[in-house]
A protein has these predicted regions:
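Cofactor- and metal-binding active-site motifs of prokaryotic enzymes
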Residues: 1-203
Length: 203
């Protein structure tokens, strides 16, 4: 069984916004920590402070995400805000990885990401997916996807996108735990015995 929660905050203080997101996750999922939390946050926040407050409040086992340009859930949307998707599941096994130095060596960054994948070591989970978030301003997004596909022998379906910064085009970040990192790519690996669908929609 899989339980999910999509949460949103328009609070402007980084620590307060992080606590607000974490509190909403706890209200939705109960006392047990989420297996994974995916965070999208405006560049107006101090991301390290925001992420630390989220972690201290709802204690996700894995947290990834990126800076963004407009944040939303199914009920709310805005700019200069933050949102997150949390889930806990008995049907999906998750892990996370990061590749740094995308600009200098995107192939190495891809190898570092794939080194964290558990699905290449087991046949227990026939369906393998990964959410990929990359620093858009570091470039090489297309080559990263190609390299990830080759390194996984085409056995994974990938979804994701590039980090934003409220359309300033100055500096973008991906999130790995409580770190906000530029010039990097992060992945959330999702392993399951049943297929996962990927839906496409924007705006």
């Amino acid at each position: 069984m899989t339980h999910t929660a999509a949460v949103y905050t328009d609070r402007t203080d980084s620590a307060d916004a992080g606590r607000h997101l974490g509190e909403q996750v706890r209200e939705a999922l109960g006392a047990d920590a989420p297996d994974a939390l995916i965070v999208f946050a405006s560049s107006r926040f101090d991301h390290a402070v925001l992420l630390a407050a989220i972690a201290d409040t709802c204690h996700p086992r894995i947290m990834v995400g990126s800076s963004s340009a407009g944040e939303f859930t199914g009920q709310r949307r805005g700019e200069g805000t933050a949102s997150a998707l949390a889930f806990r599941s008995t049907a999906i096994q998750v892990s996370a990885g990061i590749g740094r130095g995308v600009t200098a060596d995107s192939a190495r960054a891809a190898r570092d990401v794939v080194a964290s994948f558990k699905g290449l070591e087991t046949r227990e989970f026939p369906h393998r997916s990964a959410l990929i978030m990359t620093d858009a301003l570091a470039g090489h997004a297309d080559s990263l996807v190609e390299e990830l596909t080759v390194l996984t022998s085409g056995k994974y379906q990938f979804a994701g996108g590039g980090a934003g910064d409220d359309a300033r085009f100055a500096q973008t970040y991906v999130f790995y735990g409580t770190e906000a990192v530029s010039d990097a790519v992060v992945a959330l690996e999702l392993l399951s015995k049943e297929p996962l669908g990927i839906g496409v929609g924007h705006g």
